[in-house]
Amino acid sequence: MTQISAKDVPGMGRRQFMNLLTFGSVTGVALGALYPVVNYFIPPKASGAGGGTTAKDELGNDVTASGWLADHKEGDRSLVQGLKGDPTYLIVDGPDSIGDYGINAICTHLGCVVPWNAGANKFMCPCHGSQYDATGKVVRGPAPLSLALAHVNVENDNVFVSQWSETDFRTDEKPWWA
């Protein structure tokens, strides 16, 4: 066998360069498209001692108890981003306290977001008329079940939302969402 000198070895041709460029571009796009899919299946990191998720406001900022209480009056129910990114109502119990539970705002009938009607003191679904009392218990269908609950904990002024797995205090039954 004869040795080929370095100057006789042909350089990368245009076709090979274009193949490498195409492969790199397709690989980059595929990885970019797969990232959100893979991220969906990875559970969020636990925060706080209770293992909850940090509550976030409508802009995606962490909710602080002091800021929330300064902007919301007693009896107010306002939305935050809770577990799994679901809209969750934080309840202001008093001038200086956030309730120890939150109410998931997803209607149990068809999944619409249920707004709080302060005048009627209940949640009223705009899609098909289901109604829930101030604690999220269904009072008028077609929704078959009460709204899901979540624990709310305040630690070092940060608000955390965690899974509710105990008995539902509204129905004295096991929670359907756990």
UniProtKB/Swiss-Prot annotation:
Disulfide bonds: C112-C127
Stated role: Component of the cytochrome b6-f complex, which mediates electron transfer between photosystem II (PSII) and photosystem I (PSI), cyclic electron flow around PSI, and state transitions.
Xref: HAMAP family: Cytb6_f_Rieske
Main location: membrane
Cofactor binding note of this UniProt entry: Binds 1 [2Fe-2S] cluster per subunit.
EC annotation from Swiss-Prot or TrEMBL: 7.1.1.6
Protein name, as recorded: Cytochrome b6-f complex iron-sulfur subunit
Cofactors: [2Fe-2S] cluster
Keyword Translocase found: yes
Occurrences of domain Rieske (ranges): 65-161
Family: Belongs to the Rieske iron-sulfur protein family.
Source organism of the structure: Synechococcus sp. (strain RCC307)
InterPro entries in the record: Cyt_b6_f_Rieske, Rieske_2Fe-2S, Rieske_2Fe-2S_sf, Rieske_Fe-S_prot, Rieske_Fe-S_prot_C
Superkingdom as given in the UniProt entry: Bacteria
Gene3D superfamilies xref list: Rieske [2Fe-2S] iron-sulphur domain, Single helix bin
GO molecular function: 2 iron, 2 sulfur cluster binding; electron transporter, transferring electrons within cytochrome b6/f complex of photosystem II activity; metal ion binding; monooxygenase activity; oxidoreductase activity, acting on paired donors, with incorporation or reduction of molecular oxygen; plastoquinol--plastocyanin reductase activity
Keyword list, A-Z: 2Fe-2S, Disulfide bond, Electron transport, Iron, Iron-sulfur, Membrane, Metal-binding, Thylakoid, Translocase, Transmembrane, Transmembrane helix, Transport
Localization: Cellular thylakoid membrane
